[in-house]
Amino acid sequence: LVGSEMCIRDSNSPKDKIVFDVSHQSYVHKMLTGRKNAFLHPEEYDLVSGYTEPQESEHDFFVIGHTSTSVSLATGLAKGRDLTGGNENIIAVIGDGSLSGGEAFEGLDYAAELGTNMIIIVNDNQMSIAENHGGLYRNLKELRDSNGQCECNFFKAMGLDYIYVNDGNDVQALIEAFSKVKDIQHPIVVHINTLKGKGYERAEQDKELSLIHI
């Protein structure tokens, strides 16, 4: 959620375009772009979609309900910007769980090929629906354990620039990271290590507790 807030804080939406993977990551984005009442008042719950929705707001660019799509969609926006001489930031937000999808790999590959402004925010909380497994996740762990400094770096190997934020729940650390990459003229991955459920003790103690009914 903090990452979503920082995207809005340090971007000029809707000129700068933010694409959220799956769409549930976009709820704070919706709250900060004029739609908060739909989350606060039961009589207004049906006024917004559960997904990003261009017909609902100029801050939304796609109807997104599937995983692993944000990076590829953002590369399309970046290509369109470049063809029309634009200069806005294109930002893709994706979780580590979604990185295992093939379309995410395709998007990363094409972002490197474009070589122009694109900011790819990887929210790494070490969880998908359950724990992550596989070679990619071993490398993400190596990056976390080395504070982003290990020689083997999946993102750099694909031709992308890279910075690491060790405490992605630290608002000031996020502000500093986003200020460094705003208006950058090449594709860069901002790898953010976060704790899922930070601030709610039950969620912090049970990493598979992604939804709590009280």
Where are these regions (language model features)?
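Cofactor-binding active-site loop characterized by glycine-rich and histidine/acidic residues
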Residues: 4-5, 9-114
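Short beta-strand segments
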Residues: 19-22, 93-94, 119-123, 191-196
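Glycine-rich beta-alpha junction loops
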Residues: 24, 125-127, 169, 194-199
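Short acidic, glycine/serine/threonine-rich loops at helix termini
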Residues: 28-34, 99-108, 130-135, 141, ...
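Conserved thiamine diphosphate
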Residues: 79-89, 134-177
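Mobile "lid/hinge" segments at catalytic clefts and subdomain interfaces of large enzymes
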Residues: 112-137, 143-145
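Terminal amphipathic helices with adjacent charged low-complexity linkers/tails
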Residues: 172-211
